Amino acid sequence: MTAAPLTPDPTHPRRRRKSYTFFSLGIYAEALLFLLSSLSDACEPPPPFEAMELKDKPKPHYAIGEIIEYTCKKGYLYLSPYPMTAICQPNHTWVPISDHGCIKVQCTMLQDPSFGKVHYIDGRFSWGARVKYTCMNGYYMVGMSVLQCELNGNGDAFWNGHPPSCKKVYCLPPPKIKNGTHTFTDIKVFKYHEAVIYSCDPNPGPDKFSLVGPSMLFCAGHNTWSSDPPECKVVKCPFPVLQNGRQISRTEKKFSYQALVLFQCLEGFYMEGSSMVVCGAKSSWEPSIPQCLKGPKPHSTKPPVYSESGYPSPREGIFGQEFDAWIIALIVVTSVVGVIVICLIILRCSEYRKK
């Protein structure tokens, strides 16, 4: 009797595939662990620096003990004895690591111009730095007042312009004015701070010319006078009339430039506006003529000003300085009497003890 052939179990192949899968995963895990262990014994790429860069092409990882070499970037110079190499340490760090060995390329140091001075704004003259020029009083600048140290394509530093110069200040004659003149009309060139004075010509008409504006001009800069010249013109303000009031200054029939008028209201009226007006350059009163309104003057809502008369100062209080003097005298007298009483009490006590 022969045994029946065994029927293959359909689950066996699945077990083989599962064991094969576990075997593959183990190989992958060992490879990953090996890779991680190898990477754990390496340094990452060194950090970038502003002044220096790697001499060779950077790599993703570096072995322990591996040495890298740096070089200064364009626009920087090597400063001995700082090292330009770094070593991958067992703790996965780079030592030493610093860009102190590379300094910026410097421009040539600039000298002070004649009658002027150069100021280093940033306190240095390497590329990126700026300088500012100034001239002495009585001199003006020709050229750029601010220069900057820049870098060209070859890595060399240069100033972006030529240094300026300081020239002596001169002024051409000031402008002539209509109906007037100025002093020193025969001078063709004026030095720094030299001045002229303007005046008006006599007017053949009934009203005189008034000098409106500054009477004196001086040479303030190269071909620059201190202000615009004045004008000579007729300025005539209308006769000021104040209803329910009167002038308290001298009365005149004509009021020319800068004539001053003071006003006062009649009894039973109060003034609204300024009590003083001046004849302005446009033949009008400045400020406008006030008004005198009937009735008592309204009380001001503003707090009293102590500096004005009629109000006590904070130190005076309600009773004033006289009351303060009485208080001081009373304190002095009281103190003297108190001392005398104490002395008498002490004397009586000593006599009582002797008895």
UniProtKB/Swiss-Prot annotation:
Q: Which Pfam families match?
A: Sushi
Keyword entries, A-Z: Cytoplasmic vesicle, Disulfide bond, Fertilization, Glycoprotein, Membrane, Repeat, Signal, Sushi, Transmembrane, Transmembrane helix
Q: What is its main location?
A: membrane
Transmembrane regions: 327-347
Q: Sushi domain location, by residue?
A: 43-104, 105-168, 169-234, 235-294
What role does this protein play? May be involved in the fusion of the spermatozoa with the oocyte during fertilization.
On assembly, the entry states:
Interacts with C3b. Interacts with C4b. Interacts with moesin/MSN.
Q: What is this protein called?
A: Membrane cofactor protein
Q: What is the lineage of its organism?
A: Eukaryota, Metazoa, Chordata, Craniata, Vertebrata
